[in-house]
Amino acid sequence: MTKKAKTAMTDTSGAKQVQSVPAVSDVAPVNRTYKSTLFIMLFQDKNNLLELYNAVSGKHYTDPEILEINTLENAIYMTVKNDISFLIDGRLSLYEHQSTYNPNLPLRFLIYIAKLYSRMTRNANLYGTKVIRIPPPEFLIFYNGKEELPERAVLNLSDMYEKEDPHAGLQLSAVMLNISGENNQKLKEACRTLKDYAIYTDKVRRYAEELELADAVERAIRECMEEGVLKDFLEKHRAEAKEMSIFEYDQEKHMRQEREEAWEDGRAAGVNEGIQLAKQILQLSHQGESPAEIARKCNITLEQVKKILE
């Protein structure tokens, strides 16, 4: 029997009616051409996901069945699935993993949440006079890349508008949490799976500096299993985890190289643009913005900001 998600509707008399709409997870087709990142492989398990939600929210839930995972298939990613969405506490949570900084995530989240709400209300009367109740969303990004970013940053949709408008009718804010290295230790201590994941990915990245990538991943897996890090998961999914880790690292390296090449091309082709960018960075610095915030707003790395400010 198909599960149903409940949408409450209130009429003008105050009486509530409940309309059933199909849960997203029941109606979305599965497309196996997309690979899940290691992060998603871990946290699509309800026990791990509940552990992460408790760590983020400060809650202490113990029953993973209160989670309703409703991740969209074939949403807006190209070849790698790095997001998960779920309902709990009357809220709609969207978690995404990133190994490279992406300033366009607020817009991507907007597109994603619109598709989710569309699915959730597919049988509701959007043209009626009764209010259709929808769960409020929250957007979290778990970042574990090489770029030096703050432990916590807020990415706003309004920062993407061509024209600054304090009265813009649409806003969306996403919180980015840096889980690389020593960042957000308290959060990682509260979620063992997240801590182990961060340890594993840090090992892969470190060993890849001196070994062939496949050898670096194999060494990281072997050490983690010996140290009890993701041991059960790696015992069950060793081959798949190795394949995904190699693919992810190659993707991360490729994207980083593309950004570096674009930066160099821009410098060679547009000296004037570089001057204007430097002026913008200096102006933001004089206004009290931190180097990390300047990097985010200008869509460049923290190292590039620091070089200009020196």
Regions from the language model: what does each represent?
Residues 1-310:
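Elongated, amphipathic alpha-helical interaction scaffolds
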